[in-house]
Amino acid sequence: MPAGVSWGQYLKFLGCALASMMAGSQAVHLYYKPLEDLRVYIEQEQHSTQVDPTAKPPESA
C-alpha cells in the first residue's frame, strides 16, 4: 500500500474521508440551498443569451 500503510488503515481512512465528504455536501445543501432557484437561474440565462437570428456579425477592423 502507499507509504507502507496497512490495508485496514487505508480502508478506514478512505471510509472516513468519504463519510466526511458526504456530510459536508449535505450540510452545504441544507444551509445554502443551491438548487432551490436553479430553474429561475437557467431561465434568466436563456433569456439573456437569446440572439436575433437576422443579426449580422460585427465587421472586423
Swiss-Prot record:
GO-annotated biological processes: mitochondrial respiratory chain complex III assembly
Tissue: Expressed in the brain.
Residues that span the membrane, as ranges: 10-32
Broad class of the protein's primary localization: mitochondrion
InterPro entries tied to this protein: BRAWNIN
Mitochondrial intermembrane compartment segments: 33-61
Knocked-out gene: effects: Adult lethal, mainly due to flies becoming stuck in the food medium post eclosion. Rare escaper adult flies have slow motor activity, reduced climbing ability and short scutellar bristles. Larval motor neurons and adult photoreceptors have a reduced ability to maintain a synaptic response upon repeated stimulation. Impaired mitochondrial function in larvae.
Membrane topology classification: Single-pass membrane protein
Pfam annotation, one family: DUF4516
Keywords recorded for this protein, A-Z: Membrane, Mitochondrion, Mitochondrion inner membrane, Transmembrane, Transmembrane helix
One GO MF term attached to the UniProt entry: protein-containing complex binding
General function of this protein: Required for the assembly and stability of the mitochondrial ubiquinol-cytochrome c reductase complex (complex III (CIII) or cytochrome b-c1 complex), a multisubunit transmembrane complex that is part of the mitochondrial electron transport chain (ETC) which drives oxidative phosphorylation.
Family stated for the protein in its record: Belongs to the UQCC6 family.
Other facts noted in the record for this chain: Expressed from one of two small open reading frames (smORFs) encoded by a bicistronic transcript. The ORF for sloth1 has a non-canonical Kozak sequence while the ORF for sloth2 has a classical optimal Kozak sequence. Both ORFs are expressed because ribosomes occasionally fail to initiate translation of sloth1 and continue scanning to initiate translation of sloth2, a process known as 'leaky scanning'.
Subunit structure and binding partners: Interacts with sloth1; the interaction stabilizes both components.
Descriptive protein name: Ubiquinol-cytochrome c reductase complex assembly factor 6
Organism the protein comes from: Drosophila melanogaster (Fruit fly)
Gene name per UniProt: sloth2
